[in-house]
Amino acid sequence: FGYLKKNDWFHLGIGSNLTLIDFKKRKEIRELEVGIDFNYDADTSGNSNPITIGQENEFTFFNSSKFQFSWDLKTSGKDTTITRKNVDFPYVKNMGSLSFNIDYESPSYGIWEYDWRIGYEDAEKYKSFNSDGYRRRYAKVGGSFYPTDNYRIGFTARIRSEKEWLNWIENNELAVYDLSQKIISINMNWYRGTKHEIRLKSQFVALQAKNPRSLIVNESGYLTESFKDVDPFSEGITSFQIRYKYEIVPLSYIYLVYTKGGSIFENNIMRETSEIFKDPWNNPDNEIFSIKFRLKY
């Protein structure tokens, strides 16, 4: 149970968890953790966000693998943040939705392991404009490879698509898009004794928002069609860093760091996904090589 009040916003949450460990007929299961949560948010003017009821079930097996499935039910309510605290248009009314997620983490296969996740969310149709209802689909797959104790490389790919993704533009002007987001992450860690360490972190994001439809929200929070032109857009984001650390003496280090990254936003220009990934890498906002020292006296 928890209660939090901050500035013009407060949150009330109630949750319960139960762990089961005695599975005589399914001896491969080590434990099952079952949880349920209730969350309520609102601003101090009495505008209530959607109430959320969530339920989660996680199986842990003796081979160290895990399987989880969960669902969340959201009621209709008011989104009090999307219009950036506009005094005349303080919120947008959202429709209720149901979401479901499944996760799996594999056991270790000696030198490698993997995990995946799939999820969806479907919402009711808006009645104030020609709506097909919000829909979200999500998939993730990842893996790690560790042929030796001192070397590990990990890879993760995420794909997310949304129909009627709602985006604020300015004042009471909004738009819904068909959104596609793809994320690739690669990480690596290598060390030799206590003297040498190389660490790589990287993430590449490609976002596309297509088929925009212009909307406006009235003082009561209802969305209606607008005739204003809205452009599709795309954005690519790159974050890359490789770092070498050398221990001079215990607790004193020298770091050689190479960082490269940036973002490129294109309005009304549709690009291929490969171009969205490559553009911020080929035209970065920053590219820095630095040397740092950390000395203990």
Task: Please name every model-derived segment.
Residues 1-297:
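Exposed, low-structure sequence patches enriched in small/polar residues
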